[in-house]
């Protein structure tokens, strides 16, 4: 039985080798950057991560694992193909959420608990620590900015930028996503009313409740006045971070060290800030918030963090983010349900369906 912190002792011998028994479950390569840890110092038991490549929470967990230099066996759970609702995954997490990690006899299905567990469990002289020593000034700073950054309503930014592209500049979200999500919103009320009056044994009341809450949330995110309010609050958060980065420059003036948000050492706060800026740029908000020259320290930070090995490995080139999310799904769909013919025309048709997968991903679970 899961404990309140979502850490479940269990016999893990039953978990599937792969959702689709595809190449997606191959272990990730160990980083070769200077910050990578030595395999000799890792626990014998493997660390297994179930994630979706474009899930915001999954990305942050993967960045933490990569920055610490840990070997991790990654298993992709495709949200566009609803693999998070399949029985094998629901045995890991009834909440149908990614990420989930398995290590030793533990299943951990909460984003915050995963990060804390990885940082607490994988330690040693040759393992990178992302949390400064408890009681230090740097530790207090990391806790402060972790709370601040994790509180940002990324799902609201995402839905808002899809529904109101006029608020963005150079967004990497395809334009047809707006029309698609609006079409589904228009039909959602009718569809849910039908489900309420139909006898569908596979649809439980919790499921209907969850769908109604999702619809209500998206409708709230469609409110322009609400969006402008939270984007204004985002600007204040980024102002605070800009000022903090300026303090680091003044505190360490003349010293030969690379400056990060909480000091000279790269910490969890930098992981979270880097992931946040990457997502905001994808949504088309970077020109408004730092690329216009209004926050030069933030701009410098983003340029530096993108050059780190872990960020290149996990997030790749931001201009191919959407492409990297949807192409594997086309091939996995072909592998799961092979057609009677497999020619070039079918492959092109599969790739042509990338927009469909992109939309469903953006609608269902962007964080």
UniProtKB/Swiss-Prot annotation:
GO cellular component: mitochondrion
Domain GST C-terminal as annotated: residue spans: 174-341
Limits of the GST N-terminal domain: 45-126
SUPFAM superfamilies named in the record: GST C-terminal domain-like, Thioredoxin-like
Superkingdom per UniProt: Eukaryota
Keywords, alphabetical: Coiled coil
Gene3D superfamilies referenced in this protein's UniProt entry, alphabetically: 1.20.1050.10, Glutaredoxin
UniProt cross-references to Pfam families, sorted A to Z: GST_C_2, GST_N_2
Annotated family: Belongs to the GST superfamily.
Record protein name field: Ganglioside-induced differentiation-associated protein 1-like 1
Species in which this protein is naturally found: Homo sapiens
Gene this chain is encoded by: GDAP1L1
């Amino acid at each position: 039985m899961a404990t309140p912190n979502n850490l479940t002792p269990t016999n893990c011998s039953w978990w599937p080798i792969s959702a689709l028994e595809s190449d997606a479950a191959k272990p990730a390569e160990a980083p070769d950057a200077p910050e990578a840890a030595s395999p000799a110092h890792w626990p014998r038991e493997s660390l297994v991560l179930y994630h979706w490549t474009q899930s915001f929470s999954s990305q942050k967990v993967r960045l933490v694992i990569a920055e610490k230099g840990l070997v991790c066996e990654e298993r992709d759970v495709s949200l566009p193909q609803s693999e998070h609702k399949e029985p094998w995954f629901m045995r890991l997490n009834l909440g149908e959420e990614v990420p989930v990690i398995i290590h030793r006899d533990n299943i951990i299905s909460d984003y915050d608990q995963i990060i804390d567990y990885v940082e607490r469990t994988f330690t040693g002289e040759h393992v990178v620590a992302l949390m400064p020593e408890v009681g230090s000034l740097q530790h207090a700073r990391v806790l402060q900015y972790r709370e601040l950054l994790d509180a940002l309503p990324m799902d609201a930014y995402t839905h808002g930028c899809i529904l109101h592209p006029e608020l963005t500049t150079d967004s990497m979200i395809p334009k047809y996503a707006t029309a698609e999500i609006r079409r589904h919103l228009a039909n959602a009320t009718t569809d849910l009313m039908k489900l309420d009056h139909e006898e569908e044994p596979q649809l439980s009341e919790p499921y209907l409740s969850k769908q109604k809450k999702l619809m209500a949330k998206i409708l709230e995110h469609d409110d322009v006045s609400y969006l402008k309010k939270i984007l204004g609050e985002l600007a204040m958060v980024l102002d605070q971070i800009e000022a903090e980065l300026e303090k680091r420059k003044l505190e360490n003036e003349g010293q030969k060290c690379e400056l990060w948000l909480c000091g000279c050492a790269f910490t969890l706060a930098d992981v979270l800030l880097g992931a946040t800026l990457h997502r905001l740029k994808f949504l088309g908000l970077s020109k408004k918030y730092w690329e216009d020259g209004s926050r030069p320290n933030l701009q410098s930070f983003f340029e530096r963090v993108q050059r780190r090995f872990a960020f290149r490995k996990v997030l790749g080139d931001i201009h191919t983010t959407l492409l990297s999310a949807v192409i594997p799904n086309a091939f996995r769909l072909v592998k799961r349900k092979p057609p009677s013919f497999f020619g070039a025309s079918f492959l092109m048709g599969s790739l042509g369906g990338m927009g469909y997968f992109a939309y469903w991903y953006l609608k269902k679970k962007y964080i």
